[in-house]
Each structure stands twice: as structure tokens, then as C-alpha cells.
Amino acid sequence: MANKLTLSKSKINTFIECPRKFKYRYIDEITEEANEYMLLGTEVHEIAEEIAIELMEGNEIEDVFLNLEYDEELEDHIKGLNKFFKDIYSNGYEIFSIEEYIVDEESNMNGIVDIVIKNSRDELIIFDYKTGKPRNIDKYKLELCVYKILLESKYLDLNVVSAGIYFTSSAAYRIANFGSHSGDYFKSQSKEDIDDSDFDYVDAVVDNLYETIDMNYFKKEKGFLCRYCFYKDMCDGDFG
């Protein structure tokens, strides 16, 4: 494992989207310029972290949001974050960690987990913020599996029972459960589960990714998204 590229959910998702794009970004290390959507995501994540820190220090939610400074175009995202943190505290949860960077040498993965909350039974629930429109949880199961692997590799005595996406602009949840657990506010919003087959899929993609690196052949996944790709011009000039 020591000689292999350390993976993250972003690297794995990029490989699934297009192996050639993966090569440009992570093998050739050609940095993609930040677009408006990336900048928005960064700004909302920073504000969410600021809010969480204030709340963990014992400040009241109303006071935190009253004193919050932000641009007007972020209004919907701020309203969404307000609901999210109220849901946490009004339903008996506490914030366990925020923006935690974890490295798991066994799986050869790393990543930053946006926020983890804990219920009264010391069970953990992972959330990842998204600033786009709500989408089906199936799109995000892979990265939620990665987050569970990372978190449980560090906190060996704790169990991650659920993981979800929170869409800040629409205050919408998409949550999946790792097995069954009862009596949770966030579980009641979900009818989805993540099972062994989802983790098997992660393993299969990772194996394919490393095989592709070893063969040094990164095929193009041609489709309508190509026209928006940062690497389009150089990709069009490549053969294969």
C-alpha cells in the first residue's frame, strides 16, 4: 500500500466519471481552476464550520445566527444551516466533530468529514454538505461508505449508524442507514439502507482504479459532460 496513490472519495468519484479526467487531475497533477460552484461550496462549508464551532463553545443558536455575517446571495444556504443545527439540538444530538481530516492506512484512504453528530446511545451519524439541488441518495452511497470506513478506523469503539447529505439551499435531507437502529429523528426521514453490496462496489472500483494505474491506460468516458470539462482541449488532442 505504501507505494500506491492514497485515495479519497473525490478521487474515486472522478475515476468513475472518467478515467482520463482522473489521470489529468491526480496523476499528471494538472490543477483545475475553481469555478463559481466550487467557490460557493467552499464558502458555505466555511460558514457551517464557523457556526458549529460557536455552538460547541456553548453559544445559543439564535445568537450565533444573529451575529453571522454573510453575503446576501447566501441567504437560502444560511436558512438551511439554521434548520440543520436546530434539528440537531432540538432532537437530542450533539456535535461530535467538524471538518475532521482522517487517514486510514489499512484502506489507503483519506478524507475530510464535514460534520459528525452523536445520539444519546453514543452512535455516530455523518453528514456531508452539498450546495446544489437535492438528488437521490444512490449517487452518494459510495462517498458515505468511504466516510464510515475512515471514521470507524479512528474511533474503534464507536459505531456509525447513518450517513447523509444535507442540501443547504433547500434544507433537504438524503439519509441512508448502516443496518437498523431505532428512535432517531434522522433515521425517521430515511427509507434507504447501505449494505455490504455497497461496500463491495467500493472495493471493486478501487481495484479497477489501481489496475488502470498499473496498466497506464486511462480511457475517455465520452458524453455530454465533456463539453463542460476543464480538460476538454487537452483531451481532444490526445489519442486513445
Describe the role of every protein-language-model region:
Residues 5, 9-56, 99-100, 228-231:
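Nuclease catalytic cores
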Residues 2-4, 19-30, 123-126, 203-213:
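Short amphipathic alpha-helical segments and their helix-coil junctions
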Residues 50-135, 142, 154-164, 173:
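Catalytic cores of nuclease domains that cleave nucleic-acid phosphodiester backbones
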Residues 37, 137-140, 195, 199:
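Flexible, glycine- and charge-enriched loops at secondary-structure boundaries
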Residues 30-37, 133-136, 216:
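Short, polar/flexible loop-turn hinges at active-site or ligand-entry regions and domain interfaces
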Residues 6-7, 78, 152-240:
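Metal-dependent nuclease catalytic regions and adjoining charged, substrate-binding loops involved
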Residues 43, 142-150:
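Short amphipathic alpha-helical face segments that pack within enzyme cores
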Residues 5, 140-144, 222:
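Active-site-proximal structural scaffolding
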